[in-house]
């Protein structure tokens, strides 16, 4: 146990006027540290020890020797990093983080708490006296105009999309984000667009009328220049060889959502696993890169498949918490990869002399998703397609799977149908779906694709061998995680969208459709894929798919009219034909879809895709870390916040911010989440399917307890047009600090009057290093994914 301080709290701390032996010794490894303002100063061990000693005196815990012991532990960790990583440069904030860590590890709880509170107060003091540069103020003021009355949107934008500018030690503003996207667009297209067209596209994005791929919005610049995969939203693949698992990992690490098939038709193509022969390959040193992690997985799988074994050396992998400079986020350290390799080894060796089962392939891929979430990507999105008669996959989330197989939570599961099921077959699946409580498995109807796809794509599928003589699509054709884009195995979905507003007219929607199609057509030219196999390039070039979506449909009465939907669809198709010719590429085989738009809807204040808003007036709550500089700035400017449920106001590690929101459409035609029955939701989905999408409208149907039988009857009657559908039990459960809470008009107006006018330019005074989390956005986020 820690010692109790044996001196008065008022003891005067003195420091030596000369440099100590410890400082001289440690400077051989760590000559300098970086201050908050970017200045480099000589490393000083005594300053660290003295700071810890002052904290111990204040909390009456420990003595000078204890303080020096903790300081040696802190600096010892820095020394290990300095040996492992060339040009390692500690920062003041990083050193203070280590001090907190080792105070806690040594059980100096009171000292650690006092030290954390002291740091927070000092940060507030620095922020209150910090000057925001005039040009930053001006940029922030100009950008704020585009978020007029949308404090939630500006917050989500800064949190999810604003990149760090190292030279100015701050996050970019909305105008700078749009210009970074436009600069990358010019870099790739050159004079294939006129200045007038570039201006039209830029203005449409700035005014939040249309959006490109939000992945490309995040990563335009160095990251997308290095590998275009990070600019795409989602993918689909049906693994048939060990390398395919590594490609899934690579794409997930790039931030792409991954749809995958574990049907018998592809899993049975994986090789037979040889029995272990006792041979062990030399230890493999894992390179500290996405490619290095993926190579390690491929090597492990191939080795275990061949009856041999191998060990891995993780010493090159950067420590947990290190910044990921190109993609953003923080490194996880080696533990997630170590866990994945151990899991994959166990699964492969358990099947010696046989092949992997479909559930084994599913679990390994889910474990990849879990590894990637831990390894720097904020969230991953996956969908697993399986055979209708695969009982193990049907029951994959039965009971308390989150206790025994928690990795399975990262993927939604859907059953594949190639013909219309009998009543008995569908009811078996339906009962399992109802009992699961999580709406699984969903439906992926491969058998309807030949009827619902555009003729040009049906012809392409015939030539590619996907369409049988009976007119049914077969083979590895699937979908992205939210089911709005129909994909071949090893193909990307390419999204852009129209944001429909309450005041839109037919003319304004058609102009937005034109701009969104230009964006999608441009994005389809980005095929520098790097690590993954050439099949991905071949499939993308052959089809040049677009996914022009309409979000905010329940904000805009005009956008919900069938004849307007058809005109918007036709405008997008015609625009794609014209600009594909100009860009020297093929026309897209399919153009229109509806994506859920979870994060986009929060950022740009619109209803999510095909779904209505929560209520006419509601509170939107957002979780955020207590250590996040963005939270501290919001708190200090008076934004309402509460500790997470079960945590105290003083000791919380997560806080909940509250934003009042008003829906724009309060006409008689307006509908909200609880206004639509399951059948009404399905009928509206059908309207969009038949009048707008060449792919599929993504939706999750909320079903009341007494609606399940009526819903399954509707599904049977409309089987020929169903592509992909998901269902969830409608929940009326109310719990504290829920993401959404309906309120009255009076409460909304009262909350709005009290809500501060947040000056986001002040973030520069709080954020001394890159804290942006660029891997948060998943364009296919829907349902529970909207809980940000």
Locate each region found by the language model.
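Extended catalytic cores of very large enzyme megasubunits
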Residues: 1-788
């Amino acid at each position: 146990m820690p010692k109790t301080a044996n001196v008065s709290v008022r003891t005067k701390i003195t420091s030596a006027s000369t440099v100590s032996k410890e400082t001289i010794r440690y400077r051989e490894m760590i000559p300098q540290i970086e201050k908050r303002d970017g200045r480099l100063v000589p490393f000083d061990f005594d300053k660290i020890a003295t700071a810890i000693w002052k904290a111990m005196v204040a909390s009456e815990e420990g003595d000078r020797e204890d303080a020096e012991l903790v300081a040696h532990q802190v600096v010892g960790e820095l020394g290990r990093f300095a040996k492992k990583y060339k040009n390692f440069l500690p920062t003041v904030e990083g050193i203070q983080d280590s001090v907190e860590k080792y105070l806690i590890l040594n059980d100096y709880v009171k000292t650690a708490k006092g030290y954390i509170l002291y740091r927070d107060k000092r940060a507030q003091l620095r922020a209150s006296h910090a000057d925001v540069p005039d040009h930053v103020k001006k940029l922030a003021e100009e950008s704020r105009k585009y978020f007029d009355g949308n404090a939630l949107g500006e917050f989500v934008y800064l949190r999810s999309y604003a990149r760090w500018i190292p030279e100015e030690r701050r996050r970019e503003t909305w105008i700078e984000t749009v210009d970074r996207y436009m600069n990358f667009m010019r870099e790739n297209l050159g004079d294939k667009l006129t200045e007038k067209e570039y201006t039209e596209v830029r203005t449409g994005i700035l005014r939040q009328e249309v959006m490109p791929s939000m992945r490309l919005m995040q990563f335009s610049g160095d990251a997308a220049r290095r590998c275009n995969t990070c600019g795409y939203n989602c993918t689909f693949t049906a693994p048939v060889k060990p390398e395919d698992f590594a490609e899934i990992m690579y794409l997930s690490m790039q931030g792409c959502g991954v749809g995958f098939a574990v049907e018998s038709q592809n899993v049975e193509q994986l090789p037979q696993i040889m029995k272990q022969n006792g041979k062990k390959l030399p230890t493999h040193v894992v390179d500290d890169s996405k490619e290095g992690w993926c190579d390690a997985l491929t090597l492990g799988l191939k080795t275990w498949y061949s009856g041999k074994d191998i060990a891995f050396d993780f010493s090159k992998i950067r420590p947990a918490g290190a910044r990921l400079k190109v993609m953003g986020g923080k490194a996880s350290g080696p533990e997630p990869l170590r866990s994945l390799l151990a899991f994959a080894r166990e699964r492969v060796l358990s099947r010696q002399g046989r092949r992997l089962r479909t559930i084994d392939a599913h679990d390994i891929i889910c474990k990849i998703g879990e590894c990637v979430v831990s390894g720097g990507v904020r969230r991953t999105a996956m969908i697993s397609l399986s055979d209708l008669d695969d009982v193990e996959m049907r029951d994959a989330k039965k009971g308390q799977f989150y206790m025994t197989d928690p990795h399975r939570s990262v993927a939604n599961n859907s059953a594949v149908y190639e013909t219309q099921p009998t009543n008995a077959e569908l009811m078996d699946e339906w009962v399992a779906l109802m009992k699961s409580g999580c709406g699984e498995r969903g439906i992926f109807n491969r058998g309807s694709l030949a009827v619902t796809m555009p003729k040009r794509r049906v012809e392409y599928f015939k030539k590619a061998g996907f369409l049988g003589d009976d007119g049914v699509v077969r083979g590895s054709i699937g979908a992205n995680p939210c089911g709005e884009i129909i994909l071949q195995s090893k193909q990307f979905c390419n999204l852009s969208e129209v944001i429909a507003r309450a005041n839109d007219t037919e003319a304004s929607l058609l102009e937005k459709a034109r701009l969104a199609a230009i964006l999608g057509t441009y994005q389809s030219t980005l095929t520098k894929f790097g690590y993954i196999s050439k099949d991905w390039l071949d499939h993308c070039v052959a089809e040049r798919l677009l996914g022009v979506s309409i979000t905010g449909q329940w904000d805009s009465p005009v956008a919900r009219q069938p004849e307007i939907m058809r005109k918007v669809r036709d405008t997008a198709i015609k625009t794609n034909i014209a600009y594909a010719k100009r860009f020297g590429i093929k026309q897209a085989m399919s153009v229109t879809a509806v994506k859920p738009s979870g994060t986009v809807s929060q950022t740009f204040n619109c209803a999510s895709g095909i779904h209505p808003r929560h209520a006419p007036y509601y509170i939107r709550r957002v979780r955020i870390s207590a250590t996040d500089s963005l939270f501290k700035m919001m708190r200090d400017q008076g934004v309402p916040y509460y500790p997470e449920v079960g945590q105290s106001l003083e000791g919380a590690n997560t806080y909940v911010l509250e934003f009042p929101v008003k829906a724009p459409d309060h006409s008689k035609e307006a509908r909200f989440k609880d206004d639509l029955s399951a059948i009404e939701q399905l009928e509206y989905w059908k309207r969009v399917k038949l009048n707008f999408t060449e792919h599929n409208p993504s939706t999750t149907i909320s079903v009341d307890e007494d609606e399940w039988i009526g819903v399954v009857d509707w599904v049977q009657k409309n089987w020929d047009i169903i592509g992909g559908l998901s269902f969830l039990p409608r929940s009326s459960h109310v719990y504290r600090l829920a993401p959404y809470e309906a309120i009255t008009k009076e409460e909304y107006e009262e909350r709005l009057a009290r809500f501060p006018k947040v000056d986001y330019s002040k973030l520069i005074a709080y954020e001394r290093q890159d804290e942006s989390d660029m891997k948060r956005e998943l364009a296919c986020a829907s349902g529970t994914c909207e809980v940000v």
